[in-house]
Amino acid sequence: MTVAISNPAAPPVSARAYLSVIGGTCALLCTVGFVVAFGVFQGYYTEHLLRGMSEFDIPWIGSASIFLLYVSAPICGVLVDRFGPKVLLIAGSIGVLVAIFMISLCSQYYQIFLAQAVLLGISMGFVTWPPFAVVSRNLPHHRGLALGVITGGSSVGGIVWSIMIEELLTKRNLGFPWTVRVLGFTMLPLLAFACISITEPPKQSQPQPRPALEATVEGGSASPTPKPEYASLPLLRSTVFISICVGFGLAFLGLFNPFFYISSYAAGHGASAQTSSYMISIMNAATLFGRVIPGIVADRVGHYNVMIFVLLASGITSFCWTEVRSLTGLVIWSIAYGFSSGAILSLQGACAGKIATPQNQGKAIGFLQGSLAVTVLVGSPIGGQLLGHYGYLSLSMFTGATLVMGAVVMGYARLCLNRSPMEAHQFRFLLAPN
C-alpha cells in the first residue's frame, strides 16, 4: 500500500501569534523559570533559614510546587479549550504575586511550604499551561520552534532569578525578605504583559481544511478518507499517548535532580558558595539553547525522533556525573546536561500536540503534564534519600537509568506510529517523520 500525503501551505504568521509567543515566554520566565531556580532557595534554606532540617525535608518544597504545577495541567487544559486563556492567566498571576510576597514574610518550614509549595504551585499552573495550547493553535506549522521559544523563557528565568537572588543576598546584603519582594516586583510587569498578549487565533468562518490523506492499495482501489469523527476519539485510548505518558513519567523521576543538587555537588568538590550557585545559572543558560535549537531540528526531522535522542543523551550524561571532579569539567558537564534536558522540556508539548486536533491542544498537553505530577513529586525526594544514604554515585545512576528507560518507552511510542495506521488516521497523524 502506498500512502500519498498533501499538506496545505503554511499560512502567514500574524502579529497576534508573535505576541502570544512573547507573552508565553514572559509567563514561563515567571513560573517554571522560578521553579528551576529552587536550587538557590534550597541552598539558602539549608544553610540559614531552615538550618537543621534534613536533606529529605527541604526538597519537598520544590517537589510539591512542581507537583501542583503539573497536577493542575489537565484542569487548565480543559478550561483553556472551553473558555480561553484570559481568566486563567489573570487569576494565576494574582496568585503568583501573592505567594511571592507571602514567602518574604515566612520564617518556619510549614509557612514556606504553604506559600512556596502550595499557593505558588497552584497559581503557576494557571499561568504556565494556557500559553502552550494558545501557541500551538496560533502556530501549528512551527509548533516545535514556537514551543521551544516559550519554554526558553523558563531557562532565562532560571538564570535571572538565580543571579538576582545571589547578588541581592550575598553582595548587596539586602536580606531574604526584601530579596524575595524585589523578585515579586520584577515579575509584576512581565505577568501583566503575558495576560494582555496571549490571545487565541481568530475563529475561522469555515473549518480549516484537513490534510489530504490518500491510500492506494494493489489493484488500483483507494481506501476512503478517515471520517472526521475519528478526531474526537479519547486520547486515553491511544496506545501512542499512553506510551508517551509512561515514557515521560519515567524520565521525570530523575530529570530535575541535577538542577536541585548541582550546587551542593560543586561545593563538595571545592567550589566557593558563589561559584556553586552559578552552576545552576550555567545549566539553565544551556537549557535555553537546548529548548530552541532542537525545536528547529524537530520540525524538520520529527519531534519523536529528536525526543528519543535527547533522552538518551541526557541519560548518558547523567551516568558520567560523578566522573567530573574539576571545576572546568563541571561547567562542561552542566552545559551538556542543560542542553539535552532543555530539549526534553520543550518538545514534550509538541509530541502531545501532534496527536490532537487544534481544538483539543489544551486537553492533550494538559493530560500529558498531569500524568507527570506524581513522578515530579517523588523524584527529587527519592534523589535526596539516595544522596543522603549512598552518595552522588547512586543519585547519578538513578537519574541516568530513569532517562534511558524513558527513551526506550518513547521508542516504542515511535514504533506504534508506523505499526498502527488506523490510530494514525484517528488522531490525524501525518505519516511523515514523527
From Swiss-Prot:
Where does the record say this protein resides? Cell membrane
State the organism of origin: Aspergillus fumigatus (strain ATCC MYA-4609 / CBS 101355 / FGSC A1100 / Af293) (Neosartorya fumigata)
- One Pfam annotation, family name? MFS_1
- Tree of life domain: Eukaryota
- Offer an example of a GO molecular function term for this protein: transmembrane transporter activity
Q: Where is this region: Disordered?
A: 201-225
Family the UniProt entry places it in: Belongs to the major facilitator superfamily. Monocarboxylate porter (TC 2.A.1.13) family.
Provide the function of this protein.
Answer: MFS-type transporter; part of the gene cluster that mediates the biosynthesis of fumigermin that inhibits germination of spores of the inducing S.rapamycinicus, and thus helps the fungus to defend resources in the shared habitat against a bacterial competitor. May be involved in the secretion of fumigermin.
Q: List all membrane-crossing ranges.
A: 21-41, 60-80, 87-107, 112-132, 145-165, 182-202, 240-260, 278-298, 301-321, 327-347, 364-384, 393-413
Q: Which UniProt keywords apply?
A: Cell membrane, Membrane, Transmembrane, Transmembrane helix, Transport
What is the induction note for this entry? Expression is up-regulated during co-cultivation of A.fumigatus with Streptomyces rapamycinicus that triggersthe production of the polyketide fumigermin during the bacterial-fungal interaction.
Question: How would you describe this protein's topology in the membrane?
Answer: Multi-pass membrane protein
Q: Which InterPro entries match?
A: MFS, MFS_dom, MFS_trans_sf, Proton-linked_MCT
What protein name does the entry list? MFS-type transporter AFUA_1G00970
